[in-house]
Amino acid sequence: MGQKVNPTGLRVGIIRDWEAKWYAEKDFAAYLNEDLRIRKYIEQRLADASVSTVEIERAANRVNISIHTAKPGMVIGKGGSEVEALRKELNNLTGKRVHINIIEIKKPDLDAKLVGESIARQLEGRVAFRRAMRGAMQRTMRSGAKGIKTQVAGRLNGADMSRVEAYSDGTVPLHTLRADIDYSWVEARTTYGKLGVKTWIYRGEILPEKKSAKGGN
C-alpha cells in the first residue's frame, strides 16, 4: 500500500498535519474553492520565490496564510512592500481580512517540492535528465537526507515513445508511518511535451512524544 498511495496523505494525523485548518458544514464547497484560488494565485504570483507549502487557517471573517519559502526576502520585499501588496491582492480576491506569515525554509535541498522544481527547470533548459536527477540527489544527500528517490516520466530527451526513469540513493521506507518522507510531483514543460517529476526524500524518523506518567514517585 505504501508504494502506491501519496506518502503525505498517508501520514496525515500521524506525523503530518493538514495544510488547510478550518471546519465548515454549509460553506465547505465555497471555502474549498477559495482555498484553491488562493493557492493558485500565490503559486503564480511567487513563481520565482521558491515557495514550497501554503497553509491556510480560517477564523470568522479572517484568513491566516503561512507561506513556506526558501527566499523570504523576495516575498517580503524592501520594507515589507511586496508582502503588503500581496496581502491587499488576496484581500480583494477573497473579500476577507488576510494575514500573511512568512516562514523560511532553512534547507531547501531537503524539501521535495523545491528539489523537484529544480529538476524540472533544468529539464526545461534542455539539461540531460540523468545529469539533473543525479545532481539533485547528490545535493540532497549532502544536506543530511537519509535517502532520496527521483522519477521522471514522458518523452525523455525527445524520444518518440514516452518512458519512466527512476533513480534512488539511500533508503526510502514508504511503509513506515513514522518515517518523515517528503513527496512532491512537478511538471516540466519542454518543447517535446510535458514531463512529470516525482521526488521522495527521507529525512529520518519522527517518534511520537511519550506521555508523561501520572502519579510518579
From Swiss-Prot:
The residues covered by the KH type-2 domain are 38-106
A single GO molecular function term of this UniProt record: rRNA binding
- Which key words tag this protein in UniProt? Ribonucleoprotein, Ribosomal protein, RNA-binding, rRNA-binding
In terms of Gene3D superfamilies, this protein maps to: 3.30.300.20, Ribosomal protein S3, C-terminal domain
Protein's GO biological process: translation
Q: Which NCBIfam families match?
A: rpsC_bact
Write the protein's name.
Small ribosomal subunit protein uS3
Organism, as annotated: Lactiplantibacillus plantarum (strain ATCC BAA-793 / NCIMB 8826 / WCFS1)
Its taxonomic path starts at: Bacteria, Bacillati, Bacillota, Bacilli, Lactobacillales
Q: Which gene encodes it?
A: rpsC
